């Protein structure tokens, strides 16, 4: 059994990209080309990015990149990203009536869209949202198209107040994921946004002391050059890739920059921390429909005088 931690066992403000598997090489289990969510968090190389240390999930450097959206748009010409009011939206993780104790909400994704939209169009940033501002480790993920291809995913294992944390990692994941070019205005209608809040950090007894589809994992290991590295996958990654525990660990080692042959003895040297997450995803179409619904029902302030699709 794992030993429960109250807080993540990471350095202050360490961020990590946990989504998007790009052709990982697995030891003795074939190759898997595209993944929906993956991330690596090395523990000692490059410098800080936007006041936080980030980890690039493709290179294993300590410059992070990380976390979704769908096609379609409504014929709306005005909206107010500064408002923060929302209409009913999809429940977190697609559940029905079991989310009353969850912190994560669809409004958080809408706020991320507000922040990104205002940045791309050069408008003032939206006013503070109405959801809780409690501190949580968090990730923001962007995906695109009908097949929901990863477009950016970055987050932090340090607990951040949600208002400032989501604002920061919205832009970091959209514009500074080293695996992708920055998001553009033209891509907005095809985007999906996901917000993941990380909870229940526990020290695992060994590298197999976790469950696929339940736990996210963060591993710490010493590479072939004697340098400490870390890497992480969010809880959904292994299940989406149809990986077992060994495949997941081996993929994560490669994402963390380990280049030597992976043996069963080496896997036993890994220090593993497991965690869970609350996640919600909405599409750009749902975001626009929500904002329009609120405006029509008088719950938004007067919309700004600009064309949303100009």
UniProtKB/Swiss-Prot annotation:
The species this protein was found in: Homo sapiens
InterPro entries: AMMECR1, AMMECR1_dom_sf, AMMECR1_domain, AMMECR1_N
Domain of life per record: Eukaryota
Span of domain AMMECR1: 97-291
UniProt name for this protein: AMMECR1-like protein
Polar residues bias spans: 28-66
List of residues that carry Phosphoserine: 74
Keywords: Phosphoprotein
Region (Disordered): 26-95
CC per GO annotation: nucleus
